[in-house]
Amino acid sequence: GFRSPCPPFC
């Protein structure tokens, strides 16, 4: 699965 780095991408 892919998780967007947060922050900056939420």
Swiss-Prot record:
Keywords: Acetylcholine receptor inhibiting toxin, Amidation, Disulfide bond, Neurotoxin, Postsynaptic neurotoxin, Secreted, Toxin. GO terms for molecular function: acetylcholine receptor inhibitor activity; toxin activity. Disulfide bonds join 6-10. Changing residue 1 to A: No change in inhibitory activity on human alpha-3-beta-4 nAChR. Changing residue 9 to A/R: Small decrease in inhibitory activity on human alpha-3-beta-4 nAChR. Expressed by the venom duct. It is found in: Secreted. Its main location: secreted. One of its GO terms (cellular component) is host cell postsynaptic membrane. The modification Cysteine amide is found at residue 10. The keyword Disulfide bond applies. Changing residue 7 to R: Increase in inhibitory activity on human alpha-3-beta-4 nAChR. The keyword Disulfide bond applies. Changing residue 7 to A: Gain of selectivity for alpha-7 nAChR. Increase in activity for alpha-7 and important decrease in activity for alpha-3-beta-4. Exists in both cis and trans conformation. Inhibits the human alpha-3-beta-4/CHRNA3-CHRNB4 (IC(50)=15.7 uM) and alpha-7/CHRNA7 (IC(50)=77.2 uM) nicotinic acetylcholine receptor (nAChR). Incomplete inhibition of responses is observed for both subtypes, indicating a potential non-competitive mode of action. Negative results: does not modulate oxytocin (OXTR), vasopressin (AVPR1A and AVPR1B), NMDA (GRIN1 and GRIN2A), and muscarinic (CHRM1 and CHRM3) receptors, and voltage-gated calcium (Cav) and sodium channels (Nav). The cysteine framework is C-C. This is Conotoxin Czon1107. It comes from Conus zonatus.
